[in-house]
């Protein structure tokens, strides 16, 4: 969205319930900031407390309503981008949750009470977007039943990247012993790092292996391949295997 522009979108709540005991529920909406941390976990915080928060740009209605089973309920969200908005992604989330006073306990019967929070996340993109992905390091280790590979990814740009990644482990003869086909990894936010382990459910015999991690950041650059050595010793205590230094190359 351009600085100074405005648009309205609709978030639909579909209360899909077929149980005989389904009842209308009172819900309340609010805004949170959000991010994805270095470990790949989505984190939420109070509105307008995180860098690049878009929470002040949103107005929504209704803030509170009653939803009934079998119906779709709309929340209208108006986004107004300030004229002085900086380039890049600005993030916010519309949170919908059940009102606490809607949770009624019956002291004469056993009950399981579930409270929920749902989030519709927003990426508001202000032009002059940059996506600059890099593979900073690569670590690999073997446990009794798994190979765990941990790449450290970095986005030096100001807009989210959705990398495509694949993984292959070969033995000393160059024969593939385990691999993962290409798939989309977690989003890598602008200015962020991500170190999320990739797990292969396989048991490796003692020996020396080569781990190849290939990544296409889809940022206009060529795919990158990180290579590291994995040494699986004879195990006596079930500890992890050694891992060698990383080598990365652009193809």
What is the role of each PLM region?
Residues 10-14, 78, 148-156, 199:
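Short edge beta-strand/loop segments characteristic of extracellular beta-sandwich folds
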Residues 16-21, 35, 83, 100, ...:
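Short, acidic/polar linear motifs in exposed loop/turn regions
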Residues 90, 94, 207-215:
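A short tyrosine-centered beta-strand micro-motif
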Residues 17-77, 164-167, 171-177:
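Surface-exposed binding patches on compact interaction domains or structured appendages
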Residues 4-10, 73-75, 86-93, 145-149:
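Short, solvent-exposed loop/turn segments enriched in Ser/Thr/Gly
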Residues 2-3, 65-73, 185-194, 220-222, ...:
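Short proline/glycine- and polar residue-rich coil/turn motifs
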Residues 66, 80-86, 201-205, 218:
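Short, surface-exposed loop/turn segments at beta-strand-coil junctions that are enriched for proline
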Residues 1-23, 64, 133-146:
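Beta-sheet-dominated interaction scaffolds and their linkers
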